Regions:
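Helical substrate-recognition/capping region of FAD-dependent monooxygenase/halogenase enzymes
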Residues: 1-3, 7, 23, 77-79, ...
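Core Rossmann-like FAD-binding/catalytic domain of the broad FAD-dependent monooxygenase superfamily
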Residues: 1-352, 356-359
């Protein structure tokens, strides 16, 4: 029997598959599209996602294909400098097309032994106390112990489970695509600058060789958003907002998106779970979607692996919903607020100017930047040291870097005292004796996702906390 079927071969599904494979879980990824998409949905990784790649030893691959940008200016496109001394070793945004991100994650998943089947569409599922039966469009039936729906905003898995998806429908829509432009670059730049003085959802960004990424408000909301717009729709809307269509032609791909925000009522139903856009949708303001999905996978992977491998403590798998559902709710509010600030209406523009003024205060700028980059997230792991529940930033050690010790996806005790022991949890938790000038606590216990589960120097206190996240001791 397959351990876990992942429905959906996008970044969330591929990241989840890799996390599961690090723990020896037999994973099958089912992707309904026969070949990788050329549609560039997202354009970059925020700080926390960059840290995630570094924690798994993947960052150099991504840096080789991306470009670093300042983190400032991502909240509603308000142009402000990056805050000073952001609490990370990676204070930048990595510009990288999602098509490249997908390819790198697929390569990683395959290297780890993941089977990826393309052209396989899940159309039905049934579960019992022992597993899940998945039915494919060609009539094939597959049996697995668990199944995770990473199949996007129109998730078949979510619909088959009957999980509610409440929220706000789209009120406005935006056209997005890549196409050739015949107008001179200087003309494009001048017209775009003028239009964007009042219409923030308008832009033409050069990609090279005469190709531009074009974004322009649509006329109304389409009855069926799964139907791609036409090049003529782009021309019409460009003329409406800019007085010219810039001579657009030869589209690579065309799409549309709205400002809908929806959040699944629950992330788990028995042996089936949801992650990524299958669990939450929102407008793309602030570049949150792909990053939110990657971090869902990073949170879920080790917990589901623990369940499959038989050492998960009670409630560990349910903590995926407990921890990630509020994060998504916060992101929905964040993206909705930013989208409102893009409106050309006088009211939202007045608020935008006020927010811009407030961001001149360092604390306000830092607060919003930390929310955009997701480094402010703190899970409820109990009371105690201020580090508890927070993700641990990378720090320099005497013998290397902290994140170099987390590539295997296990728990980690970083012990600056040399007096502690992980005892009967050594098969699940690595023990590193090393010191860092950047760390002012004797020792920290990190979960496989890099969040701090314990901090201190008392051996008995450590042993009392290990079972909550790593199950019963062995031996």
């Amino acid at each position: 029997m397959i351990d876990v079927i992942v429905a959906g071969g996008g970044p969330t599904g591929l990241m989840l598959a890799s996390e599961l494979r690090l723990h020896g879980v037999h994973v099958l990824v089912l992707e309904k599209e026969a070949s990788p998409t050329t549609y560039v949905r997202a354009l970059g990784l925020h700080v926390r996602s960059i840290e995630v790649m570094d924690q798994r030893g993947l960052l150099e691959r991504f840096l080789a294909h991306g470009r670093r940008y300042p983190v400032g200016g991502f909240f509603a496109g308000i142009d402000k400098p990056s805050p000073d001394r952001l609490d990370t070793a990676h204070p930048y945004v990595l510009g990288i097309p999602q098509t490249t991100t997908d390819r790198l994650l697929a390569e990683r998943a395959t290297e780890l032994g993941t089977e990826i089947r393309r052209g396989c569409e899940l159309v039905g599922l049934d579960q019992d106390d022992h597993g899940v039966t998945a039915e494919l469009a060609d009539g094939t039936r597959l049996r697995s112990r668990y199944l995770v729906g990473c199949d996007g905003g129109r998730s078949t898995v979510r619909k088959l489970l009957g999980i509610g998806f409440p929220g706000q429908p789209s009120r406005v829509e935006t056209l997005l695509g890549e196409m050739r432009v015949t107008a001179p670059p200087e003309t494009v730049a001048a017209v775009v600058a003028e239009v964007r003085r009042t219409h923030k959802r308008f832009g033409l960004g050069p990609l090279g060789d005469g190709v531009y990424r074009v974004v322009v408000p649509a006329e109304g909301v389409a009855e069926d958003r799964s139907v791609a717009p036409t090049i003529e729709e782009f021309r019409q809307q460009l003329r409406l907002f800019a007085g010219t269509d810039f001579g657009v032609h030869s589209p690579r791909w065309l799409s549309r998106f709205g400002d809908a925000t929806r959040l699944a009522e629950r992330y788990r139903s028995g042996r089936v779970l949801l992650a990524g856009d299958a669990a939450h949708i929102h407008p793309p303001t602030g570049g949150q979607g792909l990053n939110l999905g990657l971090q869902d996978a990073f949170n879920l992977g080790w917990k589901l692996a623990a369940e499959v491998n038989g050492w998960a403590p009670e409630g560990l798998l349910d903590s995926y919903h407990t921890e990630r559902h509020p994060v998504a709710a916060d992101v929905l509010d964040l993206t909705r607020a930013q989208f409102e600030l893009l409106s050309p209406e006088p009211g939202p523009q007045s608020v935008r100017r006020l927010v811009s003024d407030l961001m001149d205060f360092e604390d306000v700028n830092r607060y919003l930047t930390e929310k955009i980059t997701a480094i402010q997230i703190r899970y409820d792991v109990g009371e105690g040291h201020d580090l508890l529940g927070r993700r641990m930033r990378d720090v320099e050690l005497e013998r290397g870097r902290l994140y170099e010790l987390t590539h295997g996806g296990r728990g980690l005790l970083l012990d600056q005292t040399g007096r502690l022991s992980v005892g009967g949890w050594a098969d699940r938790v690595d023990h590193a004796v090393d010191v860092s000038e950047e760390l002012d606590v004797p020792a920290v216990l990190l979960r496989p996702d890099g969040h701090v589960a314990w901090a201190g120097d008392d051996q008995q206190d450590l042993l009392a906390h290990l079972p909550r996240w790593f199950g019963a001791a062995v031996g």
